[in-house]
Regions:
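Low-complexity, Gly/Ser/Thr/Pro- and Asn/Asp-enriched, turn/coil-prone segments
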Residues: 58-81, 85-87
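Short, low-complexity N-terminal intrinsically disordered segments enriched in polar/charged residues
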Residues: 17-67
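Surface-exposed, charged secondary-structure patches
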Residues: 76-139
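Short beta-strand edge/turn micro-motifs at domain boundaries
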Residues: 125-133, 137, 141-175
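A broad structural signal for short, well-ordered beta-strand segments within beta-sheet-rich domains
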Residues: 28, 113-115, 164
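Sec-dependent N-terminal signal peptides
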Residues: 4-13
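Conserved aromatic-histidine-acidic binding/catalytic patches
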Residues: 24, 28, 124, 142
């Protein structure tokens, strides 16, 4: 009898771990992209208003990127040359707020920006991940626009939220 109960418990636990989750949708990807945009704008606003922009950036990295969920994250920011590929949360934070471990960083999020428009050209869904590629346009406080190209990969965390695990951004090639 005890053996039967133990087997049933183990079988139930194994099935709970391997049971498929709800598929990621285009709407899920759009929602996390909007949240990323809102967070980027919030970091800049806190900086401009004299608030704790570093805390907002840390909260953004913890909530939207996979670091706090135990995922490895590949981060290749738009405006980076000396340290183009970033493998740690500290290196990503340095890019956004500019006073970290990478001397070249000026604080991309401190511009500040007032809007980010995403234009996904394609999204690939595979199990508990989705990869989106396209162009996004950043509008700064003076109304100037900068277009960049991106590839973001999102992985579903244990709590069901999407986390950024690949962030690759670059400026368009000019002939």
């Amino acid at each position: 009898m005890a053996r039967t109960i133990l087997f049933a418990l183990l079988f139930s636990a194994a099935n709970a771990i391997t049971e498929p989750t709800e598929p990621i949708t285009e709407a899920d990807v759009a929602a996390v992209q909007q949240e990323w945009s809102d967070s980027l704008i919030s970091i800049g606003k806190h900086y401009t208003d004299g608030g704790d922009y570093q805390a907002v950036a840390k909260a953004t990295l913890d909530k939207l990127y996979g670091y706090a969920s135990g995922f490895d994250v590949l981060f290749k920011p738009t405006k980076a040359a000396d340290k183009a590929i970033r493998l740690t949360e500290a290196e990503a934070a340095s890019y956004f707020v500019g006073d970290g471990c990478c001397a070249e960083d000026k604080g991309f999020a401190l511009a500040p920006y007032t809007a980010v428009k995403w234009d996904n050209k394609g999204t690939i869904f595979h199990g508990d991940s989705a990869t989106a590629m396209g162009e996004y346009t950043f509008t700064d406080a003076g109304g100037g626009e900068t277009k960049a190209e991106y590839t973001f990969q999102y992985a579903k965390a244990a709590d069901g939220s999407l986390k950024i695990v690949v962030h690759h951004s670059s400026l368009p090639y000019k002939k």
